[in-house]
Swiss-Prot record:
Domain of life the protein comes from: Eukaryota
UniProt GO molecular function: calcium ion binding
Record: residues binding Ca(2+) 1: 38, 40, 42, 44, 49
UniProt: Ca(2+) 4 binding residues: 148, 150, 152, 154, 159
InterPro entries: EF-hand-dom_pair (IPR011992), EF_Hand_1_Ca_BS (IPR018247), EF_hand_dom (IPR002048)
Source species: Naegleria gruberi (Amoeba)
Binding site residues for Ca(2+) 2: 70, 72, 74, 76, 81
Stated name of the protein: Calcineurin subunit B
Binding-site positions, Ca(2+) 3: 107, 109, 111, 113, 118
Length: 177
């Protein structure tokens, strides 16, 4: 892929258009942004380079977001991974993909369920020391009790989706280009 060259080839842009909701113009704009973020010019964005983005640096879930962007698990994000992940947040992105992304934030081990421990870990990232561990555990227990319909002590994707069914994910998980 042409991430090390100065521009994307037309066939690369066309291929990315098929898998995302981005226009050719948006893909080219995102590529320029990607190249600016790729400080060392190696064609990937490292975790350190991601942390230089002011909006992400202050996000308590930044490490979880980066790990989800990094589909192949090599510790950095190439342009194909970057555009695929951002397409979830496109205004034309569907609610299902937004739900799947949100679920992955909580499903740390990727087993398809959000356990008590995973929910505690992610919520701890968000609240820091603003709540005691006891208070946080009470919130986790209550959340699982309310969302866990089959009584297995964890939250499946279906249970997660149902719990968030009344949330406005289309707007809350959308970035404007």
């Amino acid at each position: 892929m042409g991430t090390n060259t100065s521009s994307l080839r037309p066939e690369e842009v066309e291929e990315m258009q098929k898998g995302t909701n981005f226009t050719q113009k948006e893909i080219k704009k995102l590529y320029k942004r990607f190249k600016k973020l790729d400080k060392d010019g190696n064609g990937t964005i490292s975790k350190d380079e991601f942390l230089m983005i002011p909006e992400l640096a202050v996000n308590p879930l930044v490490k979880r977001v980066i790990s989800i962007f990094d589909e192949n698990g090599d510790g950095s994000v190439n342009f194909k991974e970057f555009i695929a992940a951002l397409s979830v947040f496109n205004a034309q992105g569907d609610k299902q993909r937004k739900l799947e992304f949100a679920f992955k934030v909580y499903d740390i081990d990727g087993d398809g369920y959000i356990s008590n421990g995973e929910l505690f870990t992610v919520l701890k990232m968000m609240v820091g020391n603003n709540l005691s561990d006891v208070q946080l555990q009470q919130i986790v227990d209550k959340t699982i009790l309310e969302a866990d319909e089959d009584g297995d002590g964890k939250i499946s994707f279906e249970e997660f989706a149902k719990t968030l069914s009344h949330q406005d994910l289309e707007n809350k998980m959308t970035i404007r280009l």
